[in-house]
């Protein structure tokens, strides 16, 4: 008894003082070997320090003559406190017996275990230990392996544990991971797709036309087209995860597209011009539809991620006949309030007179606060001589450069505003020729 306590004390001292180098401390190694060989358990004080113990186990491969007894004791007593990498350390040692022990008790840590196998190019070892997994864990094992697109390993595990539930696991994960080979495998094994299955919508998100065609060939399209909500979400996802070929396939499969498809294409941040042209050739939009799309694009352009997308959409809509004069030119004012005020150039090029609504110039000064846009409007005929509030608006918005330009070009300026501009003129002198 005295000897055992002495060994524990030696090992505990080594763990607490210099854990990362414990394998190089002969007394500590000998004490641990003695404890394990005599059936002792690892003292509780070591178990919380899993990182250190894991490092110790990982270094055991440097002691080939002492691997089995040390590793088995440590793994079986400490592993289940949650450190998956202890299992990883065993993989270096290729100790199948201990691995099988882990597999039988792995539970919720299984996905981490598979991740470690994948990272260390050791997934092939599952062939040797798969039968050690409890049947309840096999579905989790299949899901974990499929995340890494290990098709051969997935097939092998399924053939070891064939079941209706496991077919569905493979079917679902094949679509989620965009894996046509495993989708075909699941269908060949008898997995069934229905028209109401959420996987149909999920498949659209892959933008993989071959996978989508395969799924649609295994469902009843005559039933699908009657499911209005499902069809709506199919097209919504086809736009969000944009693929021209997928949208064309859906339409050519006689799946009627929703009324707002053209609207969604214009509102997308993707370059959807090819599909827009395709839809317009099928059915030319009426004036009201074009106007509503233009209103939305201009009003919500600040939510867009790309200037080019907004510019191209507005340009195309004007080309198609959208009326930018509606609601007293509100779309022009909306675009001036956005992150992309340069789009106003499209309206000017298509005949906009900046004076038709005095708020156009004032918005460019106050909301847009962009000197180049204001100058562009003035260069294209915007009147700066009638409204006495323009310079004050520029000063209030902090745009002294615009205020100076307005004053120098004859805009009405009261004495206090002129004084402010004069005091700050030296800042802008270099900006004017």
From Swiss-Prot:
- What InterPro entries does the entry give? Ankyrin_rpt-contain_sf
- Tell me the disulfide pairings in this chain: none
Q: Is Repeat tagged as a keyword? A: yes
Q: Which of UniProt's keywords are assigned here? A: ANK repeat, Repeat
Pinpoint the residue ranges of every ANK repeat in the record: 166-195, 197-224, 356-386, 388-415
* Designated name of the protein: Putative ankyrin repeat protein R578
Instruction: Tell me what organism the protein belongs to.
Output: Acanthamoeba polyphaga mimivirus (APMV)
């Amino acid at each position: 008894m005295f000897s055992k306590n002495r060994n524990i004390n030696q090992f505990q001292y080594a763990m607490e003082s210099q854990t990362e180098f414990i394998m190089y401390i002969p007394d500590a190694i000998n004490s641990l070997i003695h404890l394990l060989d005599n059936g002792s358990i690892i003292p509780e004080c070591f178990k919380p320090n899993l990182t250190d113990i894991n490092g110790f186990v990982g270094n055991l491969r440097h002691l080939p003559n002492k691997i089995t007894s040390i590793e088995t004791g440590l793994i079986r007593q400490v592993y289940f406190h949650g450190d998956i990498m202890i299992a990883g350390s065993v993989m270096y040692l290729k100790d199948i017996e201990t691995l099988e022990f882990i597999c039988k008790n792995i539970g919720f840590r299984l996905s981490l275990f598979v991740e470690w196998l994948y990272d260390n190019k050791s997934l092939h070892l599952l062939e040797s230990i798969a039968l050690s997994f409890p049947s309840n864990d096999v579905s989790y094992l299949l899901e974990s392996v499929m995340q890494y697109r290990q098709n051969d390993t997935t097939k092998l595990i399924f053939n070891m544990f064939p079941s209706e539930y496991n077919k569905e696991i493979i079917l679902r994960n094949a679509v989620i991971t965009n894996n046509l080979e495993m989708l075909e495998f699941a269908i060949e094994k008898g997995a069934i797709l229905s028209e109401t299955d959420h996987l149909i919508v999920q498949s659209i998100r892959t933008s993989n036309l071959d996978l989508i065609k395969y799924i649609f060939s295994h469902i009843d399209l005559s039933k699908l087209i009657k499911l209005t909500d499902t069809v709506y979400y199919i097209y919504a996802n086809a736009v969000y995860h944009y693929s021209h070929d997928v949208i064309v396939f859906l339409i050519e499969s006689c799946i009627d597209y929703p009324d707002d498809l053209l609207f969604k294409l214009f509102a997308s941040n993707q370059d959807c011009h090819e599909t827009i042209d395709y839809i317009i050739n099928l059915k030319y939009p009426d004036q009201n539809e074009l106007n509503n799309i233009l209103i939305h694009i201009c009003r919500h352009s600040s939510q867009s991620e790309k200037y080019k997308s907004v510019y191209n959409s507005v340009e195309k809509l004007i080309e198609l006949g959208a009326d930018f004069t509606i609601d007293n030119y509100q779309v022009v004012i909306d675009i001036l309030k956005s992150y992309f005020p340069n789009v106003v150039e499209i309206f000017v090029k298509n005949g906009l007179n900046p004076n038709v609504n005095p708020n156009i110039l004032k918005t460019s000064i106050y909301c847009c606060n962009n000197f180049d846009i204001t100058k562009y409007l003035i260069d294209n005929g915007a009147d700066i001589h009638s409204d006495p509030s323009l310079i004050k608006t520029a000063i209030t918005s902090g745009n002294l450069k615009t205020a100076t330009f307005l004053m120098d070009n004859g805009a009405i300026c009261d004495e206090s505003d002129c004084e402010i501009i004069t005091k700050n003129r030296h800042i802008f002198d270099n900006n004017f020729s």
